[in-house]
UniProtKB/Swiss-Prot annotation:
PANTHER family: GTP CYCLOHYDROLASE 1 TYPE 2 HOMOLOG, NGG1 INTERACTING FACTOR 3. It comes from Neisseria meningitidis serogroup B (strain ATCC BAA-335 / MC58). Keywords: Metal-binding. A divalent metal cation 2 binds at residues 65, 217, 221. One of its GO terms (molecular function) is metal ion binding. This is GTP cyclohydrolase 1 type 2 homolog. A divalent metal cation 1 binds at residues 64, 102, 221. Pfam families: DUF34_NIF3. Belongs to the GTP cyclohydrolase I type 2/NIF3 family. Homohexamer. NCBIfam families: YbgI_SA1388. One of its GO terms (cellular component) is cytoplasm.
Length: 249
């Protein structure tokens, strides 16, 4: 067992949370028991994830998407009340790490995604260094790369571009980062990979010749929170369980 505050201090220092301008609080969002020995991870602090943490008798739920965001109504009602009530009823801490967890050079969502897809990271760039660029270890056609991504992430991606086009240089940013497509285009890459697509990206891809893949917000952000928890477990001797949902978004 370890003091929850010591665990949180380690996470905050490891992820350098103070360096980020975020639209969600990073760190403890719902306070539970003082000491923790078992952590459950999840992409999102959903009711299903909370129920799983209760079943596992976890002391802390560690997530990427917490429950509090800027520009939301500052009220605790409905589904939010039910989630928080379940955590408080069982004295479970809930901590969330958003942009700092996307950006960490080894534990972050972008780094972990690159490891799984075989991307060699060469550069971090863009807003708060949230984008990554690099090269494939071996060039692939867009169609072959999309098939590889589907196999690894277990989700069929949305692909915009000529499937026969050779892809060598890629840029990527996990989650809902389709708004950074122009930044990736300016970097001169062959492909931009992120988790979501909006209407405009279809036209940008066709008109600039830079391919675009949307591989799923949830699917591209599974791995950072797991890596963070497993790294903390080695430091503090914690037990870790991972929760996942079949979220198609």
């Amino acid at each position: 067992m370890v003091l929850c505050r010591d665990f949180l201090t380690w996470c905050n220092e490891t992820l350098q949370t103070a360096l980020f301008k975020d639209y969600a609080p990073n760190g403890l969002q719902v306070e539970g028991r003082e000491y923790i020995g078992k952590i459950v991870t999840s992409v999102t602090a959903s009711r299903a994830a909370i129920d799983f943490a209760v079943e596992q008798k976890a002391d802390l739920l560690l997530v990427h998407h917490g429950m509090f965001w800027k520009n939301e109504l500052p009220t605790v009602t409905g589904w939010k009340k039910e989630r928080i009530a379940a955590l408080l009823r069982h004295d479970i801490n809930m901590a969330g790490y958003h942009l700092p967890l996307d950006a960490h050079p080894t534990l972050g969502n972008n780094a972990q995604l690159a490891d799984r897809l075989g991307f060699a990271t060469e550069k971090r760039f863009g807003e708060q260094n949230l984008l990554n660029s690099g090269s494939l270890k071996q060039a692939k056609t867009l169609g072959a790369l999309a098939a590889h991504i589907e196999t690894v992430l277990q989700r069929k991606p949305v692909v915009i571009g000529n499937p026969e086009r050779e892809i060598r240089r890629v840029a990527w940013c996990s989650g809902g980062a389709q708004g950074f497509f122009q930044t990736a285009i300016d970097e001169g890459v062959d492909l931009y990979l992120t988790g979501e697509i909006s209407e405009a990206q279809y036209h940008l891809a066709n008109e600039t010749g830079t391919a675009f893949i949307s591989a799923g917000h949830h699917a591209t952000e599974r791995y950072g929170v797991r890596a963070l928890a497993e790294s903390a477990a080695e430091v503090f001797g914690l037990e870790v369980c991972h929760f996942d949902e079949n979220n198609p978004a």
